[in-house]
């Protein structure tokens, strides 16, 4: 096989990766859709609840996510999850829907990522016994690279969440320390006032 033919074939065999990455604020319910063109593709899904709109409240209850197939069938569901990952093989081509539900009274910021992996393998164009294994190795390598990228994005979202949690905890610790300090000062003033009143009362009784 010529070099030109090899390059053309590589272009045909190279996998197509469709990715949806979004960070959004949810009130009650939000739905997104993603189209799968081929059966047998792999859909990777992940989400992380990054933060709440109230610095005094950080939601530990999580959100719900329900995945529906092209005909409305339920593929998978997550209940009250702060973060999760899931992947499945596309059984039917078409539009897949991802619906989030927030049961918290606060708005939540969610990092959502969908990756669709597809490898167009044309066996009729690759009869060479040395060329076919090469294409299989390329396919596995690219899939591994995209999986690493997917995992990295999920870990970055987890890191963002933890940073916000730590920041909120630090603010709460500072506010708590200030409150306790003011409470201690107030208690000291009250104690001085009561002792002074008691002393004045005893002094008045001794004069009588």
From Swiss-Prot:
Regions of this protein lying in the Cytoplasmic compartment: 196-208
Motif position, COPI vesicle coat-binding: 198-208
TM stretches of this protein: 177-195
Top-level taxon of the source organism: Eukaryota
Record localization: Golgi apparatus, cis-Golgi network membrane; Golgi apparatus, Golgi stack membrane
Pfam families: EMP24_GP25L
Domain GOLD, chain residue ranges per copy: 29-116
Glycosylation, residue list: 168
Subunit structure: Probably oligomerizes with other members of the EMP24/GP25L family. Associates with the COPI vesicle coat (coatomer). Associates with the COPII vesicle coat (coatomer). Interacts with p24delta5.
Biological function: Involved in vesicular protein trafficking. Mainly functions in the early secretory pathway but also in post-Golgi membranes. Thought to act as cargo receptor at the lumenal side for incorporation of secretory cargo molecules into transport vesicles and to be involved in vesicle coat formation at the cytoplasmic side. Interacts with p24delta5 at endoplasmic reticulum export sites for endoplasmic reticulum exit and coupled transport to the Golgi apparatus.
Protein name in UniProt: Transmembrane emp24 domain-containing protein p24beta2
Native species: Arabidopsis thaliana
Taxon lineage: Eukaryota, Viridiplantae, Streptophyta, Embryophyta, Tracheophyta
């Amino acid at each position: 096989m010529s070099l030109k033919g090899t390059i053309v074939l590589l272009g045909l065999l190279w996998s197509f990766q469709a990715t949806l990455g979004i960070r959004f604020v949810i009130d009650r319910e939000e739905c997104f859709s993603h189209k799968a063109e081929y059966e047998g593709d792999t859909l990777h899904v992940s989400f992380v609840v990054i933060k709440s709109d109230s610095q005094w409240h950080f939601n530990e209850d999580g959100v719900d996510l329900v995945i529906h197939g092209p005909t409305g069938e339920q593929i998978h569901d997550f209940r009250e999850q702060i973060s999760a990952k899931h992947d499945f093989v596309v059984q039917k081509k078409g539009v897949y829907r991802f619906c989030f539900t927030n049961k918290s009274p606060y708005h939540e910021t969610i990092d959502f990522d969908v990756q669709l992996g597809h490898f167009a393998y044309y066996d009729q164009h690759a009869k060479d016994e040395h060329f076919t294994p090469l294409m299989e190795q390329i396919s596995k390598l690219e899939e591994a690279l995209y999986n690493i990228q997917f995992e990295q994005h999920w870990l970055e979202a987890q890191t963002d969440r933890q940073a916000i949690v730590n920041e909120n905890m630090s603010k709460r610790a500072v506010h708590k320390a200030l409150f306790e300090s003011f409470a201690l000062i107030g208690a000291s003033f009250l104690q001085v006032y009561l002792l002074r009143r008691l002393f004045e009362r005893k002094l008045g009784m001794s004069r009588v």
